[in-house]
UniProtKB/Swiss-Prot annotation:
Belongs to the TRAFAC class translation factor GTPase superfamily. Classic translation factor GTPase family. EF-G/EF-2 subfamily. GTP binds at residues 18-25, 82-86, 136-139. One of its GO terms (biological process) is ribosome disassembly. GO terms for cellular component: cytoplasm. Its main location: cytoplasm. The lineage of its organism: Bacteria, Thermotogati, Thermotogota, Thermotogae, Thermotogales. HAMAP family: EF_G_EF_2_B. This is Elongation factor G. Gene3D superfamilies: 3.30.230.10, 3.30.70.240, Elongation Factor G (Translational Gtpase), domain 3, P-loop containing nucleotide triphosphate hydrolases, Translation factors. Residues 9-283 form the tr-type G domain. Catalyzes the GTP-dependent ribosomal translocation step during translation elongation. During this step, the ribosome changes from the pre-translocational (PRE) to the post-translocational (POST) state as the newly formed A-site-bound peptidyl-tRNA and P-site-bound deacylated tRNA move to the P and E sites, respectively. Catalyzes the coordinated movement of the two tRNA molecules, the mRNA and conformational changes in the ribosome. It comes from the Bacteria.
Length: 692
């Protein structure tokens, strides 16, 4: 058997999630470094020692270009899915979490839980992803392991169980004590690849025993049997501790906590052991749920090669050498290269010409994939992020990945004629990779408009256009993606009748529209309440299409209409003259008429802004926020810094980076993410409508 195909219980699909500066990349690099060395040292006799790809003497960062990397540790295969730490890219995190089975959450031991870590943690909660925590940077000034662990309780309401205790901290950080084995672990070689277990130093013995006691107490709370043994004062074995911890981690009832300093090459190997000990294999999780294409019935697919093939596309990348790479996670069945696969989301079959596994340093072509595998396919032309790939004989649709709607737009235009064609190709490639980037051409002005999740998101897109695709573009002022909605219900009638020689046109619709409350999370709902066949059922899709078309431009300022329920109450038809087109036009007329009566209002995107600043600038920053229609929601102290959390309209935030820099002499930083849409105050709405 090839080393690649391990049994399912020996497979781990994990992500590494973290706040931007917690040291996620370094932790990932070290994992690839040690697993690479370990794997290849072990396999010399198989003749695959082609591995001097990481020059030991040079500390060079492997930034994982790939969305998924595979590595081996002690006979287990670990697939690592890359998740970015910046909030403008929450969509990337969402899609990675969908296909993960577990995660390592990396924290900076000097800060514990930081604002972005909360966002990512909540997303992981949404998908019930089991986690272990790694307190990194134990060698940094201000590192405090137990303070950092406490923030998991206060900020994330998690149940952390430290299974290690640090030996020293800051510049005296030397290693860790394993509280399960009660051994001290020291790293001996400079590159951290050699480490040894020793007895716990005498001066730390007492504290270690106290910390072990705390750990056992928490573990006893998770399991009746262990509780009895614990209360009786009986010895609890290493196997029992790990069994209970594993079960609790997989059920999201506990988070084992480890510590180390990735940059100083300490703590990584025990972290890999913890991935194997506590995080789930595909067999530990419930089967994936989907909907049968033929009748919408719920079906489940088990991680079994004999089940029909089912996979989810979670990322598309354009590789300069092999073209479009479609990354997917296999949930059930088996797929051979060169065979056909059915994309049930698009309703098309495609041929997968090659299948590759990504290693940190190379691509490995494989003949087939099985359940639990994370691979990239070549030759899939229509497949996009969120699509389901399956067996054409048993089509199924997995839950789609929900991406937030873009909130900000920019006009981009090519500088020269030569750039024009390149721009179209480049934007097509980028929007395939990133589902939160939308591209459209403005009908009236002919401008190309790109829309995304924030200023930074679009800056990066423009930067990539220049750097990767060599397209020079001019960029317009950022524009806010306003929306329109209604505040009350209204009814209206639409009649479209044309009598000109030959066949006429006849469509007649009576509609009611009503507001959908924001908490329902729906932008549109269509209900047919007609009775007695006043309008034949076959015209209903045309009526819905007419309404949707009318919703593209609202009555106030031509912005898209959201949060509206349209109910068809009545109408009439003509045996000969009625057609789909006539009903589409009549429905559109009725909707536009009803909108005018339903008290239409403008909505604007509100952003959540988190600013971290030295205390002396706080007053100026807050008074500036007040001038931007912001609502300050909380102020907290983190070390010697203040954290301000506020909600502020997107339209008031353009260029905020520069403003904040000058207010704080470059010492404050901020992160911003979309929060919700809210009604624009009347005075401001009037100005916006005037401009349009």
């Amino acid at each position: 058997m090839e080393a690649r195909y391990v049994d399912l219980d020996k497979l781990r699909n994990i992500g590494i999630m973290a706040h931007i500066d917690a040291g996620k990349t370094t932790t990932t690099e070290r994992i690839l470094y040690y697993t690479g060395r370990k794997h290849f040292i072990g396999d010399v006799d198989e003749g695959n020692t082609t591995t001097d790809w990481m020059p030991q003497e040079k500390e060079r960062g492997i930034t994982i270009q790939s969305a998924a990397t595979t590595c081996f540790w002690k006979g287990y295969r670990i697939n690592i899915i890359d998740t970015p730490g910046h909030v403008d890219f929450t969509a990337e995190v969402e899609r990675a979490l969908r296909v993960l089975d577990g995660a390592i959450a990396v924290f900076d031991a000097t800060a514990g839980v930081e604002p972005q870590s909360e966002t990512v943690w909540r997303q992981a909660d949404k998908y019930n992803v089991p986690r272990i925590a790694f307190m990194n940077k134990m060698d940094k000034v201000g590192a405090d392991f137990y303070m950092a662990v406490e923030t998991l309780v206060t900020k994330l309401r998690a149940n952390p169980i430290p299974v290690q205790m640090p030996i020293g901290s800051e510049k005296d950080f030397q290693g860790v004590i394993d509280l399960i084995k009660m051994k001290a672990i020291y790293w001996v070689s400079e590159d951290g690849s050699v480490y040894e277990e020793r007895d716990i130093p005498e001066e730390l013995r007492e504290e270690a025993e106290m910390r072990r006691e705390e750990m056992l107490e928490k573990i006893a709370e998770l399991d009746e049997e262990i509780l009895e043994k614990y209360l009786e004062g009986e010895e609890i074995s290493e196997e029992e501790i790990k069994r209970v911890l594993r079960k609790a981690t997989i059920e999201n009832k506990a988070v084992p906590v480890l510590c180390g300093a990735a940059k100083a090459n300490k703590g990584i190997q025990p972290l890999l052991d913890a991935v194997i000990d506590y995080l789930p294999s595909p067999l530990d999780l419930p089967p994936v749920k989907g909907w049968r294409v033929s009748d919408g019935e719920v079906v489940y697919r088990k991680p079994d090669e004999n089940e029909p093939f089912t996979a989810l596309v979670f990322k598309v990348q354009v590789d300069p050498y092999i073209g479009k790479l479609v990354y997917f996670r296999v949930y059930s069945g088996r797929l051979e290269k060169g065979s056909y696969v059915y994309n049930s989301t698009k309703g098309q079959r495609e041929r997968i010409s090659r299948i590759v596994f990504m290693h940190a340093d190379k691509r490995e072509e494989v003949d087939y994939v099985r359940p639990g595998d994370i691979a990239a396919g070549v030759g899939l032309k229509v497949s996009q992020t969120g699509d389901t790939l399956c067996d054409e004989k048993e089509p199924i649709i997995l839950e789609k990945i929900d991406f937030p709607e873009p909130v900000i737009s920019l006009a981009v235009e090519p500088v020269t004629k030569a750039d024009e064609e390149k721009l179209v190709k480049a934007l097509l490639a980028l929007s395939e990779e990133d589902p939160t980037l939308q591209v459209r051409v403005d009908k009236e002005t002919g401008e190309t408009i790109i829309s995304g999740m924030g200023e930074l998101h679009l800056e990066i897109v423009v930067d990539r256009l220049k750097r990767e695709f060599g397209v020079n573009v001019r960029v317009g002022q950022p524009q806010v993606a306003y929306r329109e909605t209604i505040k009350k219900s209204a009814e209206a009638e639409g009649k479209y009748i044309r009598q000109t020689g030959g066949r006429g046109q006849y469509g007649h619709v009576i509609l009611r529209i009503e507001p959908i409350p924001e908490e329902e999370g729906k932008n549109f709902e269509f209900i047919d309440k007609t009775v007695g066949g006043v309008i034949p059922k076959e015209f209903m899709p045309a009526i819905e299409a007419g309404i949707k078309e009318a919703m593209m431009a609202g009555p106030l300022a031509g912005y898209p209409v959201v949060r509206v329920r349209a109910i068809v109450l009545d109408g009439s038809y003509h045996e000969v003259d009625s057609s789909e087109m006539a009903f589409k036009i009549a429905a559109s007329m009725a909707f536009k008429e009803a909108m005018k009566k339903a008290q239409p209002v403008l909505l604007e995107p509100i952003m959540k802004l988190e600013i971290t600043t030295p205390e002396e600038y706080m007053g100026n920053i807050i008074s500036d926020l007040n001038s931007r229609r912001a609502k300050v929601e909380s102020l907290e102290t983190r070390g010697h810094l203040k954290v301000i959390v506020a909600k502020v309209p997107l339209s008031e935030t353009f260029g905020y980076a520069t403003v904040l820099r000058s207010l704080s002499q470059g010492r404050a930083s901020y992160i911003m993410q979309f929060s919700h849409y809210q009604e624009v105050p009347e005075k401001i709405a009037e100005k916006i409508i005037k401009v349009v």
